[in-house]
């Protein structure tokens, strides 16, 4: 094991999937900034050809704000030269054998050159179509494993999963692997091949349906299969099956599985507050800031397990450094905060309310949006009752008026009905996390932190991933929400 992460990355050829996703970009920036002597980074991008892959690299990676520190340090021309020298954009798709690569010479070259494989590719939609979820999160993970096993210099496969494959279990949740066929329902057996066959059969039944009907039916089918086996949604179910396949078929390839919790904006590197897209917590924050969150389903005492993106990347690099070349190893790391530095939804609610009271968003009319703290309801029954009294009864009255006077309120009825259905569906999707009662044990991750401290050479804290260092009030109010407003809302 090499004790120094920067030295470890030097002269390595690395394959990274999942670009241009949020976490993959943070990882690429980190490597280029701290170890420009990395030999090569193969960056797998979903694209039909090399030209399209290069265009995605330029527009979705090279030109974004995340790289402004490197851009300022090196200058635009030197940064572009570094990226051209070190990054090889590869058009591909992990849901296809050999990662969807078509150039046989390129495949052979990659198999002969690659030292480390980092799989971040995933679909994270909770209610993803079952065929897509299986293709990417389950069998895509197996395709990456099979590709990695053919890399003659392959020292390690690092796979990014999610801590929430634990389902809705309460208590202390351990860093342990899933056994093939294990379920969370307890009284059922899971056969991944049967799940694949059922998915294919369902698609065959839908071949004469519209695209919209196929999409919705496959989403509902995935949710039904997940709940049958004890998982709350298609995302975590398909990720769990992906872990099972990797564990069973890894042979002697060193396998590290990183299970992050809810990933948030960067806390330190390359600069505080960078984020892309609305994550789980962010949808709540934005709705609150826009004055749309009058009532919300959550347990004020439940721990919301958050972890900044740069800490996840630091843990990934530290784990890769620790286990590279450890033949036969399968190591699992929870990367989160609930065990060492928990923050509750009630605290997050207070931080958010205080922020927008002092610094309100500006509405379309140019005036500050005045927000009220709103009501938190801690059970689905309470929330359903609230929705019935506040919205559904008025909707029924509007429906009756629409029947009697069909020309008067038809648009209002349809619009309100659609919004209520969407709100209830979102609440049902997020409910397992808003009322979550589990705490993610991070004993393995703590041992990794201790090992790094014993051998520490990165004295500047450039590979910090200890959640105890986070001041949640300061981070949420001075880093995360401002970053969200700047980089996502563009205000």
UniProtKB/Swiss-Prot annotation:
It holds the Pfam family Sterile. GO terms for biological process: lipid metabolic process; response to salt stress; response to wounding; suberin biosynthetic process. It catalyses: a long-chain fatty acyl-CoA + 2 NADPH + 2 H(+) = a long-chain primary fatty alcohol + 2 NADP(+) + CoA. One of its GO terms (molecular function) is alcohol-forming long-chain fatty acyl-CoA reductase activity. Induction: Induced by wounding and salt stress. Expressed in the endodermal cell layer surrounding the central vasculature in roots. Expressed in the hilum region of seeds. Expressed in lateral root tips, cotyledons, the shoot apex, young leaves, petals, stamen filaments, and receptacle of siliques. Keywords: Lipid biosynthesis, Lipid metabolism, NADP, Oxidoreductase. Its EC number is 1.2.1.84. Belongs to the fatty acyl-CoA reductase family. This is Fatty acyl-CoA reductase 1. It comes from Arabidopsis thaliana (Mouse-ear cress). The lineage of its organism: Eukaryota, Viridiplantae, Streptophyta, Embryophyta, Tracheophyta.
